[in-house]
Amino acid sequence: MTDILVSKIRNFCIIAHIDHGKSTLADRLLQDTGTVQQRDMQEQFLDSMDLERERGITIKLQAARMKYKADDSQEYVLNLIDTPGHVDFSYEVSRSLQACEGALLVVDASQGVEAQTLANVYLALENNLEIIPVLNKVDLPGADAEKIKQEIEEIIGLDTSNAINCSAKTGVGIKDILEAIVRRVPAPQDEIKLPTKALIFDSYYDPYRGVIVYFRVISGSLNKREKILLMASKKNYELDEIGIMAPDQQQVDELHAGEVGYLAASIKSVADARVGDTITLLNSPANDPLPGYKTANPMVFCGLFPTDADQFPDLRVSLEKLQLSDAALKYEPETSSAMGFGFRCGFLGLLHMEIVQERLEREYDLDLIVTAPSVIYKVNLNQQEHIFIDNPSTIPDPQLRESIEEPYVKMEIYAPNEFNGTLMGLCQERRGVFIDMKYITTDRVTLIYEIPLAEVVTDFFDQMKSRTQGYASMEYHLIGYRKNDLVRLDVLINSERADPLTSIVHKDKAYGIGRSLVEKLKELIPKQQFKIPIQASIGSRIIASESISALRKDVLSKCYGGDISRKKKLLKKQAKGKKRMKAMGKVEVPQEAFMAVLKLNQ
């Protein structure tokens, strides 16, 4: 393997918004360079998870090595490092960009530049990548390549005079892209003589070999059977195998600076080999790790409960297995009077949450109830102390706290300007603070808002898409905590608090939400032998209340005529029984009721 000159290596990635044809383009590159034979080809070859193919998104990174004979009759090695395009996975994107020297910026010629593309382009520019603009889907009837080129120049400031028009589906322009990669993407720096450093840009769990780590050698070289040290986790391992992805794994004896490969070293869990960590040699380690490593912190939390209590052990095992391949997933056990045993889980964002839930249901065959998503609140206690809380039901009572702060995000929404009004309306409904509005082109606008994260994690994305016919796109990042007039809204069923329905809401919205919650529960909870009050409360103050009337059993049906005192005695006995029942009786809330209420727009 070492006969490859560093000057003949090109490491690049593809930046694109969801649905702009990134995976199809990757397939076409693999096919045209002969890396994957026609008969083995399947659509979206690099998206190995069924879920990725179905949703058409890239979740876990993949990498592939291609050999390409260029027009100058030299053979080059092209390493394609795949990146996820979704905002939840932006840290993973930033790491894979650090492993590259160039990027293909793929823009749909019929749709134009979208928010997440922009966010990733700025990351690429920060890493000094050579960016090659590619206009995909030029074969579509609605494609307007010239207009989109102008848009790229105006929005991003990239020179598009040598942008490439292509159609990944029909294969037009693929040769031009390969030539552009060879000519325009710089070769890696030749740092074979320096101490070994390699950047982990992805890892996944293999049940037979332990964690498989994808890495890019930045300096020095790695040999089979060497002992390695991971600088952030301070753990050391002996290499079992190293190799390249072509795109199936092939073992090699050595990889040197500039090359991209995989390693297996009997690593037990993905958390030990975090994305962004630096690999070095145990016997002659590098002095300092590569910059930019950070652990991904969850931003969105929810409770996961099995619908069948017997499945709790299975849920625990499945979460343990999932965590082996998803280091960003955090969980801890939680119990609830209404739902039984379950787990409180933390995720990077809403998409991450949906994917984990779907993988649990699909790969591990579980049936789950998911409580409403919440964020981490900062609760300032009276004694100048503060605590962070991710579960609304554990927030202290009003007399024990001074204020609640919630996380805010800075959000940029890109949309055609005819949707300006509806989007501003949506942001105002969600307590957004207007910051700025920029016209990027004559018919597209950027709205910048600062908005509470709690308002974004519910259904903001769906609402934004439906109000703009799918044309708007957004991206956001955390900007810190702010004090707000927030209250804990509890739901009491027969004077008992139902934890899964507790939420943190703004005081102005509390009445409306409380009202709709109790009305919905009244429809869904079946009648009992006694009257059930359903109340929404803030602290000790009831703000909305409904009651479910009792079922009436006719105790007088056996008395035909006869003395009135006999009837009175029976009625009195019934009233006494009902009183006792009300004091002792537990209301079984059906799970459908919880499901429906959780679906109620937050």
UniProtKB/Swiss-Prot annotation:
GO function terms (MF aspect): GTP binding; GTPase activity; ribosome binding
Domain tr-type G residue range list: 7-189
GO biological process, any: positive regulation of translation
Catalytic reaction annotation: GTP + H2O = GDP + phosphate + H(+)
EC number(s) from the headed UniProt entry: 3.6.5.n1
Record-level GO cellular component terms: plasma membrane
This protein's UniProt keywords: Cell inner membrane, Cell membrane, GTP-binding, Hydrolase, Membrane, Nucleotide-binding, Protein biosynthesis
Ligand binding (GTP): 19-24, 136-139
Subcellular location: Cell inner membrane
Primary residence: membrane
InterPro entries: EF-4 (IPR006297), EFG_III/V (IPR035647), EFG_V-like (IPR000640), EFTu-like_2 (IPR004161), G_TR_CS (IPR031157), GUFP (IPR027518), LepA_C_sf (IPR038363), LepA_CTD (IPR013842)
Membrane topology, as annotated: Peripheral membrane protein
Class of this enzyme: hydrolase
Role according to the record: Required for accurate and efficient protein synthesis under certain stress conditions. May act as a fidelity factor of the translation reaction, by catalyzing a one-codon backward translocation of tRNAs on improperly translocated ribosomes. Back-translocation proceeds from a post-translocation (POST) complex to a pre-translocation (PRE) complex, thus giving elongation factor G a second chance to translocate the tRNAs correctly. Binds to ribosomes in a GTP-dependent manner.
Family: Belongs to the TRAFAC class translation factor GTPase superfamily. Classic translation factor GTPase family. LepA subfamily.
Stated name of the protein: Elongation factor 4
The organism's taxonomic lineage, starting at the top: Bacteria, Bacillati, Cyanobacteriota, Cyanophyceae, Synechococcales
Gene: lepA
